[in-house]
Amino acid sequence: MKTAVEELSPTRVKLTIEVPFEELDHAFDVTYKSLAKQVRIKGFRPGKAPAKLIDRYVGRGAVLTQAVNHAVPELYSEAVSKEEVPVLGPPEVEITRLEDGKELAFTAEVDVRPKFEVTDYEGIEVTVDDAEVTEEQVNERLEALRQRFATLIGVDRPAEQGDHVSIDLSASVDGKKLEDAQASGVSYEIGAGTLLQGLDEAIIGLSAGESATFTTTLVGGEHKGREADVTVTVHSVKLKELPELDDEFARLASEFDTIEELRASEAERLGELLRAQQLRQARDRVLEKLVDSIDIPLPESVIKQEADRRRELLDRQLSQSGLSKEAYLEAQEKTEEEFEAELTENATRAVKTGFVLDQLASQENLTASNEELTQYVVEQAQSMGISPDQLFQSLMQANQLQLVYVEVLRAKALDLVVSKAKITDESGNTIEPPTPVHTETITVASGDEETEESAAEQGETEK
């Protein structure tokens, strides 16, 4: 087999492959065996007819076509391996010469990874947010804890802002009750703003057993967007009573005996949280600077494939949530054109990020151990709420275990860059690079989200 490679662009090549007929013997053997089982020739049992009779019965052209179709994928793979071509996606194949008994020649155009080196990746400078814990932040955490331990006490008075009420809602349009816009026994906190516009104003001042009607725009269901008259009936009014921030509360809400111990614990936890956020921010900003510093050509077909994958994933998520594409765009305050432009931009960024990290991992001869691969699967499964075995089986079934290896290598490549970066906070303090987190997911064009999503769906089904 003769092979040659022609560079059509920095991201696309054409392989020319010439094969003498004697190297197609295996393909013809497979073809004849397959056809012998399909045809019925008088005097021969199924599968036993000789090749010459099969040629005569089905036509030599049909035999050649089937043999070539069987041979080309394997010959293409051999040529790619021989020429060490870093292919991306399927090729466009064209048979250029087929001389029976002499030679088969064909070309294969295919996208390839761009050739480049990752240089000057040491000493990248980034600034991250301060991780200083303020008294106000600690107070906010304690207030949230108080809210969790609040009690509701029934009161015999008109409803006020912040009260909890039990209500019925009934909507009508032009005096006709809407059957799909009725609700009973709804618990609602006045001021939350989670239901209908105008509801808070209608409830305030009502006592248990009283009703009021207001006009609003429906936000869901068959009549979404229509103006309707809504009657709200209050069944009960309850006052939220918060516990005092004292030692008794500390013993109730924690393992501590005093409020000062609880306050110190919350400050420590908040500090750990802020430091973790700070280190994640450092990784994100180092990666952003690294990718921005490198200019490489990107295959349009790969960008399109990544954009299509992201679009299909969003469509499935919207379908599962019952939200239309139009409603999603409205919530995001984007037009279809703006959505598509952002989608393409993000896909382009993801493809480029993947190329950069893959190249760095290759340059530095990074590898991933079985322990690291297992840790990745375990932590990803935990974040998805399924068992590691479920995720592993899904990856196996989708033939995507190689993607786990790629993800771990990419994370290790980023760890390497971050470990050599110069990180300071906004106050000018030097931040030590984070401990390598090989299993942390990086937003690149890896294509594994679909498998992980299907694994998560399987886990929900089995619960």
UniProtKB/Swiss-Prot annotation:
Annotated InterPro entries: PPIase_dom_sf, PPIase_FKBP_dom, Trig_fac, Trigger_fac_C, Trigger_fac_C_sf, Trigger_fac_ribosome-bd_bac, Trigger_fac_ribosome-bd_sf, Trigger_fact/SurA_dom_sf
GO BP annotations, alphabetical order: 'de novo' cotranslational protein folding; cell division; chaperone-mediated protein folding; protein transport; protein unfolding
Region ranges (Disordered): 427-463
Domain of life of the source: Bacteria
Catalyzed reaction equations: [protein]-peptidylproline (omega=180) = [protein]-peptidylproline (omega=0)
Family designation: Belongs to the FKBP-type PPIase family. Tig subfamily.
Entry comment, domain topic: Consists of 3 domains; the N-terminus binds the ribosome, the middle domain has PPIase activity, while the C-terminus has intrinsic chaperone activity on its own.
Functional summary from the UniProt entry: Involved in protein export. Acts as a chaperone by maintaining the newly synthesized protein in an open conformation. Functions as a peptidyl-prolyl cis-trans isomerase.
Name of the protein in question: Trigger factor
Organism of this sequence: Thermobifida fusca (strain YX)
Gene designation: tig
